[in-house]
Amino acid sequence: MTTTTQSEQDRVIIFDTTLRDGEQCPGATMTFEEKLNVARMLDDMGVDVIEAGYPFASDGDFEAVHEIAKRSKNSVICGLSRAAHKDIDRCAEAIKPAERGRIHTFLSTSPVHMKYKLQMEAAQVYEMVISSVTRARNHTDDVEWSAEDATRTEFDFLCRCIEAAIKAGATTINLPDTVGYAVPEEYRELFRKVRETVPNSDKARFSVHCHNDLGMAVANSMAGVAGGARQIECTINGIGERAGNAALEEVVMAMRVRQDRLPYWNRIETTMLTHASKTVSAATSFPVQYNKAIVGRNAFAHESGIHQDGMIKNAQTYEIMTPETVGVKGTSLVMGKHSGRAGLIHKMEELGYKLSRNQIEDVFVRFKALADRKKDVYDEDIEALVDEQLLHGQDQIKLMSLTVIAGTHGPQRATMKLDVDGQIRIEEAEGNGPVDAVFNCIKALVPHDAKLELYQVHAVTEGTDAQAEVSVRLSHEGRSMTARAADPDTLVASAKAYLGALNKIVAKRQRSVREDAPAVAVAG
């Protein structure tokens, strides 16, 4: 949205290429339905141009671009095409249903690309630029031309090609840093000099397309805008060839947060950024790194005691944007070995606890001991520490022994001995697999209606003797309880983790009873 301080000349077009360049990332292939879902989300969040695919590459890509073109409500739908006429014609057919369509055609212009990839002379490339843009312009008024590997192209030849492309009808000129070779000052100067040198540069919008091979894709993108570009080509989560592309969420928030140095604006609804990140991550099966800027799990998480103390007093001490701005519910104070008393007290208050000073000291000592042993300390862990302090007891359900018989034939069988509040119980159960047999055994020994929400196993270290760490999450009466356990035997770790979560439910229920909640037994 524009304001009195914003003008159209300061607007930056956001060109998302998640469905094209992003999907070219090895292993990031999306299904037809996933592409439609991502495109719908991009359209809803205010992306100006969606590069929906490369129609000539396959029938599947063509169909996806064609269907997205039919469904788009707000965005320009763009298809990529090589300089060959058959590619351009196929691209034009794919985007035809779009209310606003664009053909994006490209050709390499650097000496190394012309010699080894195209095996063409500069004069031939120049003529092909004119021919391809002219062909594309016969299909649509919105044509983008890219000088592939522009940052390694001889400047005079680059300017000649740009002038010819604009004269042939290109409305957007893209100067990609195809191999992530440029540095910000160099890239800014490239755009400034090109716009000064090319006589008809005012007839087209200039675009940046930066790869992250040296980790400077976002910085280069913003430098290009400072040099006069007014379109940024980017992807959700920065996915793309090799080290990826400039991340949409990062360039958008850089402009929002640093208006003092980056006085540009865009149409992106930033509260959808986290949702967009999760959607693309799910579609591509590419996890988002925890410390990823803007949308990473730790982007608004604080563990250091000093930082937590500052955040409790004033969030601006350690956050330059509010989490709600990007669609995150709030700041997370992550409890761990670096956390201090202030952070623990704040977390306990969030969980509804009010303890005396002596009780807090006791919980804090045991919390620090736990944090030294565990990588992450969750709300449920803190609840368990407090429950132990308030209940003056240990877990009521303890594993005494476990034997599992498994093989290639017949159902698997588990025999388990538990100490349930001082009473020894032994039971045998079958299951569809050894883990199922173990959990069925627990259900037989301790009847309950908690539902299994998560079962996850990973090796703590490498090698065949590695400990298995198992995470189990149980839901009961709208509340989830998570527990982890490690053991060289995966099945023993599984049993311990399940019982750990079940013990937390029991402790939670007992605390509710003390607070005059209805006394409903979880375990019999």
From Swiss-Prot:
Keywords: Amino-acid biosynthesis, Branched-chain amino acid biosynthesis, Cytoplasm, Leucine biosynthesis, Manganese, Metal-binding, Transferase. It is an enzyme of class 2 (transferase). GO terms for cellular component: cytosol. Its main location: cytoplasm. Pfam families: HCS_D2, HMGL-like, LeuA_dimer. Residues 12-274 form the Pyruvate carboxyltransferase domain. The keyword Transferase applies. One of its GO terms (molecular function) is acetyl-CoA C-acetyltransferase activity. Belongs to the alpha-IPM synthase/homocitrate synthase family. LeuA type 1 subfamily. Homodimer. HAMAP family: LeuA_type1. PANTHER family: 2-ISOPROPYLMALATE SYNTHASE 1, CHLOROPLASTIC-RELATED, HOMOCITRATE SYNTHASE-RELATED. Catalyzes the condensation of the acetyl group of acetyl-CoA with 3-methyl-2-oxobutanoate (2-ketoisovalerate) to form 3-carboxy-3-hydroxy-4-methylpentanoate (2-isopropylmalate). This is 2-isopropylmalate synthase.
